[in-house]
Amino acid sequence: MNRRKRSLWKRPLIAGIAVSAVTILVLSVVLFVWPRTDTPREVDAIVVLGGGSGPIRLTKGLKLALDDYAPTLLISTPEHSTCRYSLPRVSVICFHPSPGTTQGEARYVGKLASERHWSQIIVVSGRAQTTRARLRFDRCYHGTALFDPAGPVKIQNVVYEWGALAKALTIQRDC
């Protein structure tokens, strides 16, 4: 009888763990591996976010600018770095966000966009970062932000993004 009582609670526990694992896996794929993206079109500015896949993002942002999607290219750069980009027909602005996070980038772009009366931008983010970046820009930028991610998704990016998204949804709820 004692053995049977032990097995009665094991099955629901195992089922609950399995359902939780599948739910987390599906949400990870939807939010971070294949996030909602947008098709680029002509906008006022292209914004390249900094971070781990920076060179891949930068290449994509430069290509979008050279393909005449926008007359202005904003590049988020680490503090103490220099901006040495010159493109024909494109104004290049390098900026150091404060804080040096996606939230800091969204704040800077939101302020600059307001000053320059930009109504549409393209944001080039890391693929895993796209969902959280969209949330941050929705809070700080009052125009239309299209997201065109670059770079592969690594498992450590997904783990990081779960924590960063939870923080953005619970602790840092403002711009």
Locate predicted features.
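N-terminal type II signal-anchor transmembrane helix
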Residues: 4-37
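Short hydrophobic helices that act as membrane-entry/anchoring signals
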Residues: 157-175
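A structural signal for short, hydrophobic/glycine-enriched beta-strand patches
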Residues: 32-163
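Short secondary-structure transition/capping segments
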Residues: 9, 120-126, 168-174
